[in-house]
């Protein structure tokens, strides 16, 4: 009897201990997914016929309640519960990649402002097969931060059906029945031996430009270059001469009450003057721009004119816009703070850079910073007197005539 009482007491103690463990046990941590589609509808069951129980929009955080092979049962922040397709969501790891991308490039200088041509996704890295998350609407404004170029993913070639092989016709006088009884696993010998021709030349891969961009919500990601349009004033677009303007920056403004330019029926009196950077309409280039042009406003003729132009260079963004005094020359003009701009070009001693095979970034080794000051209708380079002009690289080799003309310009 005493042994039975002791066993009963031990059982009660163990039961109490287990109850205590359950009391102090922490609640299982929630799992989350994020909506990648523009909008999804929650359903009450996974079936061909179902009822809507709620909606969720792009980027919204959902709590995972249950899971099947292709669907997830979730709860929205508003308490709506239902099933969604798993392919329309991203996991926490993908969301963390985009958060880290935005934090890393939060203070990067803005190269240009662009708009989305259509509904398009932001990717975690350059490339069509990389993870995607945020979905942009047509016309969304973006700030471009960095360019990368990667090979385009080619679609898988369609299988080509081989035509049925026809047996060779029997020679004159040969046994017709013998030719017809040729075994199926034996092919007639070719009359001429097959000779291997010269090795086929493999064409270079087709490249695509991707831009790291940030939208108005602070969300960052990579977007395909051909899906955006750089914001350029209409008054400058006609001066592009078949080139693509990759950056247009306001140097300063001039007053012209008789400009003739209208905005909503009103005359624009404050006319901006620009420095622009242009490049060919081609992806995969080892530079961001190969031409620089400064447009100033002619107050007498009320139109834009070119005050400075440089071409055949390997230039890299971003550019720097500001004001400065001339530190090398005396006089009242030199002491005035006038508009200035700086940009970087590849040095002649540096190799032409190739895109990084992993990141797609183009990282030149040696760059030359060129600074100019706008003095009226003249752009003057800020270079200390007696300093030799550094030699620059060129996409197209200069002709002797161009070198001689540049030499005369330097001596002046």
Identify what each model region corresponds to.
Residues 1-9:
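Bacterial N-terminal signal peptides that target proteins for export
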Residues 22-37, 58-63, 75-114, 125-127, ...:
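Boundary regions of SH3-family modules and the immediately adjacent low-complexity/disordered segments
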Residues 33-73:
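Post-signal-peptide N-terminal segment of Sec-exported extracytoplasmic proteins
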Residues 46-51, 121-131:
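Short alpha-helix capping/helix-loop boundary micro-motifs
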Residues 399-412:
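Long, low-complexity, intrinsically disordered segments
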Residues 16-20:
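C-terminal motif of bacterial Sec signal peptides marking the signal peptidase cleavage site
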Residues 271-285, 329-349, 399:
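Short beta-strand elements that form the blades of beta-propeller/WD-repeat-like
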Residues 67-70, 147-151:
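Short, charged beta-turn/beta-strand-edge "cap" motif at the junction between a beta-strand
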């Amino acid at each position: 009897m005493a042994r039975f009482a002791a066993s009963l007491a031990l059982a009660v103690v163990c039961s109490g201990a287990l109850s205590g463990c359950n009391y102090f046990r922490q609640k299982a941590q929630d799992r989350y997914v994020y909506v990648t589609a523009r909008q999804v509808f929650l359903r009450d069951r996974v079936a061909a016929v179902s009822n809507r129980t709620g909606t969720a929009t792009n980027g919204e955080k959902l709590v995972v309640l249950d899971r099947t092979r292709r669907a997830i049962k979730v709860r929205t922040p508003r308490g709506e519960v239902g099933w969604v397709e798993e392919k329309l969501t991203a996991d926490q790891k993908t969301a963390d990649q985009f958060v880290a991308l935005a934090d890393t490039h939060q203070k990067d200088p803005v190269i240009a402002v662009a708009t989305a041509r259509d509904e398009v996704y932001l990717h975690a890295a350059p490339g069509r097969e990389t993870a995607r998350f945020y979905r942009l609407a047509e016309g969304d404004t973006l700030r471009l931060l960095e360019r990368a170029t990667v090979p385009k993913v080619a679609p898988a070639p369609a299988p080509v059906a081989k035509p049925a092989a026809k047996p060779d016709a029997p020679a004159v006088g040969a046994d017709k029945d013998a030719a017809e009884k040729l075994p199926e696993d034996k092919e007639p010998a070719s009359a001429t031996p097959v000779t291997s021709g010269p090795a086929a030349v493999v064409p270079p891969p087709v490249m695509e430009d991707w831009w790291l961009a940030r939208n108005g919500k602070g969300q960052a990601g990579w977007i395909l270059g051909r899906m955006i349009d750089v914001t350029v004033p209409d008054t400058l677009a006609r001066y592009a001469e078949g080139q693509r303007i990759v950056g247009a920056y306001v140097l300063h403004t001039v007053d012209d009450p008789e400009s003739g330019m209208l905005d909503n029926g009103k005359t624009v009196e404050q006319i901006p003057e620009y420095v622009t950077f242009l490049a060919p309409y081609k992806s995969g280039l080892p530079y961001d721009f190969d031409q620089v042009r400064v447009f100033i406003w002619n107050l007498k003729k009320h139109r834009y004119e070119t005050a400075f132009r440089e071409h055949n260079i390997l230039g890299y963004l971003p550019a720097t816009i500001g004001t400065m005094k001339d530190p090398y020359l005396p006089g009242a003009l030199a002491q005035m703070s006038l508009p200035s701009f700086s940009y970087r070009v590849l040095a002649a001693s540096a190799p032409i850079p190739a895109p990084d095979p992993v990141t797609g970034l183009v990282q030149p080794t040696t760059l030359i910073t060129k600074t100019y000051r706008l003095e009226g209708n003249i752009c003057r380079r800020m270079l200390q007197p007696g300093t030799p002009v550094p030699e620059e690289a060129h996409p197209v080799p200069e002709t002797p005539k161009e070198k001689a003309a540049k030499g005369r310009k330097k001596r002046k």
